[in-house]
Amino acid sequence: MTRIAAIPTTPYANSERVLPGYQFADAFKVPAPRGITAMEAMRLAFAHRPLWIRTLMALRNQLGRLVGLTPAPAGGFPVVRESPDEVVLGFDDKHLDFRVVVALAGGFATLTTIVRWHNAWGSAYLAAIMPFHRAIAARMLEGVA
């Protein structure tokens, strides 16, 4: 089976509406199967996380507890809102707020991450996880293709 690689793309056009005052956004896209909904795409993206992603998320949760961060929910991030073409996930924490948007348009599924930090700790946290974030976001989206 040929693996479809997620490619970087322009972040979601309505990022400001999703998370007003955001300071960071990035996005990846893959071809979307015909007839798929955004919720189905989101489930595919989050369903088959390889061991290395599960390990990194578990490590993040363990280290995060030491500094008072909210652990990532075992069942996935809460859905903020959904439509057939868009699902917004995420939550607010003391160091930063984030949203993940899975959107369908033009035959592609796009995963955009949007972040607004509250303090220096939030900015530093984002900088520290950035290399892992990019690899994880791209790999998860590849599960849709």
How should each PLM-predicted stretch be described?
Residues 69-106:
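Hydrophobic-ligand binding "helix-grip"
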